[in-house]
């Protein structure tokens, strides 16, 4: 509706920069000038339009852009992705190519990507816009699992019933 919800969250994610004011994380002012900065503060954003490479596997997309020094240990990456999926109830195969995935599986890859990077604050922009009612309920179950694990969840949506179903 043009009120600036996504713009504000993009500032927290390091995509846009505020003209004035300050960002506080755990009560302390911080400077977020890039997505890397936001991850250092435990903030990860899952955008409405996914940023995935279709010919890569889920795990390859999840670790893409990380500087882990040297060659990628794909077996270790697959194991860590599987561990995150098992912990929260996600159902994705780390070795599956993105082009073979459903929309909800692609969204799951994006969520696991921010968890892999250590996000404790997850921002989801219109997360149910392209999901079926069944996929939406499954997503809500996973989000509740994350919340129970101490993660903060911020959802940008126009669907008031979803806000009421998830908020505390």
Features from the language model and the residues they span:
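Glycine-rich phosphate-binding loops of nucleotide-dependent enzymes
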Residues: 1-168
């Amino acid at each position: 509706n043009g009120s600036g919800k996504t713009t504000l969250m993009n500032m927290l994610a390091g995509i846009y920069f505020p003209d004035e004011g300050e960002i506080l994380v755990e009560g302390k002012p911080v400077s977020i000038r890039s997505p890397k900065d936001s991850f250092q503060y435990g903030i990860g954003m899952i955008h409405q339009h996914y940023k995935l490479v279709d010919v890569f596997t889920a795990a390859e997309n999840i670790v893409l852009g990380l500087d882990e020094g040297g060659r990628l240990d794909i077996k270790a990456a697959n194991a860590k992705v599987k561990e995150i999926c098992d912990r929260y109830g996600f159902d994705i195969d780390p070795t599956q190519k993105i082009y073979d995935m459903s929309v909800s599986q692609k969204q799951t890859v994006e969520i696991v990507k921010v968890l892999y990077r250590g996000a404790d604050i997850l921002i989801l922009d219109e997360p149910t816009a392209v999901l079926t009612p069944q996929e939406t309920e499954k997503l809500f179950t996973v989000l509740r699992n994350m919340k129970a694990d101490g993660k903060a969840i911020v959802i940008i949506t126009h669907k008031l019933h979803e806000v009421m179903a998830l908020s505390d």
